UniProtKB/Swiss-Prot annotation:
PANTHER family: CHAPERONE PROTEIN DNAJ, DNAJ HOMOLOG 1, MITOCHONDRIAL-RELATED. Residues 5-70 form the J domain. It comes from Aggregatibacter actinomycetemcomitans. Binds 2 Zn(2+) ions per monomer. This is Chaperone protein DnaJ. The J domain is necessary and sufficient to stimulate DnaK ATPase activity. Zinc center 1 plays an important role in the autonomous, DnaK-independent chaperone activity of DnaJ. Zinc center 2 is essential for interaction with DnaK and for DnaJ activity. InterPro entries: DnaJ, DnaJ_C, DnaJ_domain, DnaJ_domain_CS, HSP40/DnaJ_pept-bd, HSP_DnaJ_Cys-rich_dom, HSP_DnaJ_Cys-rich_dom_sf, J_dom_sf. Zn(2+) 1 binds at residues 145, 148, 198, 201.
């Protein structure tokens, strides 16, 4: 039976680089490894073919020969080893694979575990969100121990490499091609053997501390935005880099404005006489009061847009708009004289539908509705 093309077998293109070849092999090896397929002969053969393909394509010389001559390059008498595939270090492949799972992949390297990232939720006003501000915050985190300066050992105490894991902080166990890893229980994963642990941090090298920070919040932020403060998270183990602090923004509700992205909305009440006769009013913006001209015969719900009076976008740098929705207020607590004036106004408008456009439109619609019912 003809052999399957090595590139097709690994599911990669002929231009695949070393990393792509290794990634494809890892994925397939995990799927077809005998320890997982539990005696399935067909999958066991498939695993052998995958190993064979990997050794050829991962070797520059063998790959070049395969690209030129195909499988014939490795037949007896061709000078390329007669089809023997025993040279690849598959322990390294599986070691890397499980090293990723357990926090590191190299042999003999001390484990480097970056510190945890932290989250801090902060509440600001709309004005602060629009214009930017600086806030002082206090967080509780793991910081390097001041007593031992992060070493975990008392002054003058010996710190040696763990003789069991040789400083890696992990112990490996290999059965055939299958490799497992677990933290070294002799040094508790630190890779070190400390003669006298620091009494302050008990050998960890880190202690819980309160830390004060000043956070600069840029103009234009909105609820849900995150600010990353690099290196302000928890300290890492064994002198590893600290994690980051993520400050999550929450903008308080405003008593006047509603926000939608870069745009602002507000409701502006006016008297019914101004709505009828027109006039000029002052409306609030985040930059102060501005004048708005109300035309005659303005109805409730009419929208006025004030360009550039919204929020400046952090991405585009352009300011949004402020949209004002007019609310015509009905007067309350009228005296008899005022009520009489309104009655006279109502009488004077009786039958003049052109002066009451909304009422006219509504009544016409009602009439058509009932006319349709009686047909």
């Amino acid at each position: 039976m003809a052999k399957q093309d090595y590139y097709e077998l690994l599911g990669i293109s002929r231009s695949a680089d070393e990393k792509e070849i290794k990634r494809a092999y890892k994925k397939l090896a995990m799927q077809y490894h005998p320890d997982r397929t539990k005696g399935d002969k067909e999958k066991e053969e498939k695993f052998k073919e995958i190993q064979e393909a990997y050794e050829v394509l991962n070797d520059k010389e063998k790959r070049a020969a395969y690209d030129q001559y195909g499988h014939a390059a490795f037949e007896q008498g061709t000078g390329f080893g007669g089809g023997s595939f025993g040279g690849a270090d598959f322990g390294d492949i599986f070691g890397d694979m499980f090293g990723d799972i357990f926090g590191g992949g190299g042999r003999g390297r001390q484990r480097v575990v970056r510190g945890d990232d932290l989250r801090y939720d902060i509440e600001i006003t709309l004005e602060e969100a629009v214009k930017g501000t600086t806030k002082d915050i206090k967080i509780h985190t793991l910081a390097p121990c001041d007593t031992c300066h992060g070493t975990g050992a008392e002054a003058g105490s010996k710190v040696e490499t763990c003789p069991h894991c040789h400083g890696a902080g992990r112990l490996r166990r290999q059965q055939g091609f299958f490799v497992t890893e677990q933290p070294c229980h002799f040094c508790h994963g630190t890779g070190k053997k400390i003669e006298k642990p620091c009494k302050t941090c008990h050998g960890d090298g880190r202690v819980n501390k309160a830390k004060n920070l000043s956070v600069k919040i840029p103009a234009g932020v909105d609820t849900g935005n995150q600010l990353r403060l690099s290196g302000e998270g928890a300290a890492g183990e064994n002198g590893a880099p600290a994690g980051d602090l993520y400050v999550v923004i929450h903008v308080k509700e405003h008593h006047i404005f509603e926000r939608d992205g870069s745009n602002l909305y507000c409701e502006v009440p006016i008297s019914f006489t101004m709505a009828a006769l027109g006039g000029e009013i002052e409306v609030p913006t985040l930059d102060g009061r501005v004048k708005l001209k109300i035309p005659e015969e303005t109805q409730t719900g009419k929208l006025f847009r004030m360009r550039g009076k919204g929020v400046t976008s952090t991405r585009s740098g352009y300011a949004g708009d402020l949209t004002c929705r007019i609310i015509v207020e009905t007067p309350v607590k009228l005296n008899e004289e005022q009520k009489e004036l309104l009655r006279k106004l109502e009488e004077s408008l009786e039958g003049q539908t052109k002066q009451r456009p909304k009422s006219s439109s509504f009544l016409d619609g009602v009439k058509r509705f009932f006319d349709d019912l009686t047909k």
